[in-house]
Amino acid sequence: DRMEGYLVELEDSLMNFRDVEHRGVVKKEQEIIELFYFKFMDIPLLSRMDAVAEYFIDEVETLKGFDLPDEEREAVKNRFYRMYETRDLYVLYNRFLRQEGFPSLPQVQYEKRKLRYEDVYPVLYLKYRLETQQEDSGVRHLIVDEMQDYSMIQYLIIQRLFKCRMTILGDREQTMDGEQQDVLTFLPKIFGKDIRRIVMNKSYRNTVEIASYANKLAGITEVELFERHGKPVVEKEFPGLEEALESVVRELRLEKQAVIAENADEGVEDIISYETAAVIARTADEARETYYILKEKLEAEGFDT
């Protein structure tokens, strides 16, 4: 909503109209304003002046009875473009950030500009709202997976980019975001109320034990579990990360000698170990610390890490 308000504001604040004269043909400021805000009002803001310039050039060519050379046409267009205070999306987005009280982007030379990940999609949205875009992408059906990881502004961009039928699927409980969002609350506002919702509630990826445990943590109750059983999930507490990872190494059967000792009554060829294993942490910092501790422990056991 704040971005939409900013776009409306730009319609006036970005413009500085003036008379234009070329080869004795004059287009008054008021005439340009009427063309800009009425005749060509459906064209995006930063592309609209191009239509006004072409309109004026056509008038000049009609009155003079010949076509203007390409270089002359470009020179006339540039005079119209200068009625924009700026056409630089980086500058326009920076102005929006300051206006909303957010940290500004660095004021650096063009070739040194960089956008943070969280700024990429707002800038893209500005671009697709302010500039004319090619309508037909050639895509006839678009599939969006992991729907829960897309923000509202990303869906707005998708809706503008692709005018085809779509299948959007995902699991809101599996979001990578820090805060859970239900995209179904805003998808109808973007794609219209005729969207068809299909709920698939049969879990097949995990064993009954793992799925039941995960669903209990997430507060999920309306799920039908695929009847495939495995070992029960075990919860353990440890005084620290070091001790927890020692248990992880043992539990995942990565310490060869420990596995053999624990299963002395079995033949070595009968002992099950894992080719791959995963340790999941809650944060990037925890994952980094876990990695270094595990790396040291596994290297001590002769594993190539």
Place the predicted regions along the sequence by residue:
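Inter-Walker segment of RecA-like/P-loop motor cores
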Residues: 1
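Conserved helicase NTPase catalytic core signature
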Residues: 4-141, 153-155
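Conserved helicase motor core of SF1/SF2 NTP-dependent helicases
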Residues: 103, 128-141, 148-305
